[in-house]
Every structure is written in structure tokens, then in C-alpha cells.
A protein has these predicted regions:
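Nudix hydrolase/Nudix homology domain
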Residues: 53-54, 100-102, 111-204
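A glycine-rich, hydrophobic loop/mini-helix early in the fold
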Residues: 32-63
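The catalytic Nudix box helix
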Residues: 46, 58-95
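Acidic pyrophosphate-coordinating catalytic loop
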Residues: 24-28, 96-114
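A sequence-level detector of short linear motifs
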Residues: 14-17, 46, 172
């Protein structure tokens, strides 16, 4: 199925819709959603990507044409983890402009222009409910938000992660290098506001 995305000018005035391929081919500004699930125990869920084996968002992708951000949040969680949540009460964290210019192995350029809408939502069910595609998501990792924030602050040490697959759950110790950052990003810049939001909400 062809995906259509709404696209905008640099001042974020709506222009029209275009296929996802053409949006990227023509460097058009569009919306994405970054979904984070957390628990009342200050835990936050990361997916472990099958391609990079690093901790990333709980789920993320494009906001389709005509979708609201929260509708996209719900769809992405369903598509990637196969759980249906009520995202209407998801809490806003930030909007992050994203520009990427990357030369590929064939010497052509991949260019991305997006605004990432970052939200968190409370997850109150069992981790065994997950049913994800191992070709896309290797595992899901559950870490304590306070401990993770301290790890990013001191830049050393390890924290305990609960690793969840479709078949088993186990504990392991992980260091800062397991979390995904890209060029020119720091761990606190990428994850600090999210972790702070989860910590504040978990107190409620």
C-alpha cells in the first residue's frame, strides 16, 4: 500500500500530500512520531532494533496524511508491538526538528527533513502481550528511567535491563553504548527530556 504524507514549508505551513518516496526524494518537511511507553515504577520501554542491536524508541515512524499525532502513536505501537493502547491520554514531551544528509554506498544522498513529535504513554499490562516481528525488532528492553538518566549523566557504569522477546524474559547489565545516538547528538540531548518526563509522571 502506498503511504501518503502531508508536507510543509520551513515555516510549517501545510502545502499538500505526497507519497513517502517523493517526500524523501524531494527533501520535503513532514511529521514523524516517536512513541515511548513507561510504567508506574519509573520504567521506560525501548525497542532493540534487529539491524543495529541498539536501544531506540518504543516505536516510531511517519505520521500519515490526515492522521493526528496521537492516532499515529496508536497505529505505530500496534504495528510494531501488536498491542492496542488508548493513546488519547499520551503526554507531550517535545517537537524535535530533524535534518539528515547522508551519502549512501552508491554515492547518492539520503536526505530527511522531519519534525519528530515525542510523546510518552503509560503501559499497565503484561510484557508477555508483545508480539513483534523479529526481523524488525530484535527485543524490547525495559530500564529504570532514573538509573538511565544517571547513566547518561556520569557516562560510565552499567544498569540492569529486562530483555523481553516473544518467548522469554531475562535480565542483563547494559552500558551507555547500547543506546542509539547519531552524529552530533548526545545521550542527554536525545533522551534527557523523555526520561525526565517519565520520572515526573511516574510520581503521580
Amino acid at each position: 500500500m502506498v503511504e501518503y504524507l502531508d508536507y510543509y514549508d520551513e515555516d510549517w505551513n501545510f502545502l499538500w500530500k505526497e507519497t513517502r518516496e517523493n517526500v524523501h526524494a524531494n527533501w520535503l518537511w513532514h511529521n514523524t512520531v516517536h512513541c515511548r511507553l513507561y510504567t508506574k515504577q519509573w520504567d521506560i520501554l525501548f525497542q532493540i532494533r534487529a539491524d543495529t542491536h541498539t536501544f531506540y524508541t518504543t516505536a516510531s515512524w511517519h505520521v500519515l496524511s490526515g492522521e493526528t499525532i496521537k492516532q499515529a502513536f496508536n497505529r505505530e505501537i500496534m504495528e510494531e508491538l501488536w498491542i492496542d493502547i488508548d493513546s488519547s491520554d499520551a503526554e507531550f514531551v517535545s517537537v524535535v526538528p530533524w535534518k539528515l544528509d547522508k551519502q549512501k554506498s552508491d554515492w547518492t544522498w539520503y536526505r530527511d527533513r522531519a519534525k519528530a513529535h515525542v510523546y510518552v504513554d503509560l503501559y499497565e499490562w503484561d510484557f508477555s502481550d508483545f508480539d513483534f516481528d523479529p526481523a524488525e525488532i530484535q527485543w524490547v528492553a525495559v530500564v529504570n528511567a532514573k538509573e538511565t538518566l544517571q547513566l547518561f549523566t556520569r557516562w560510565s557504569g552499567e544498569i540492569q535491563a529486562t530483555i523481553v522477546t516473544n518467548n522469554w524474559i531475562q535480565k542483563e547489565m547494559v552500558g551507555i553504548d547500547r543506546f542509539l545516538v547519531t552524529q552530533n547528538e548526545t545521550y542527554l540531548w536525545k533522551y534527557g527530556d523523555i526520561l525526565g518526563k517519565v520520572i515526573s509522571l511516574s510520581k503521580i
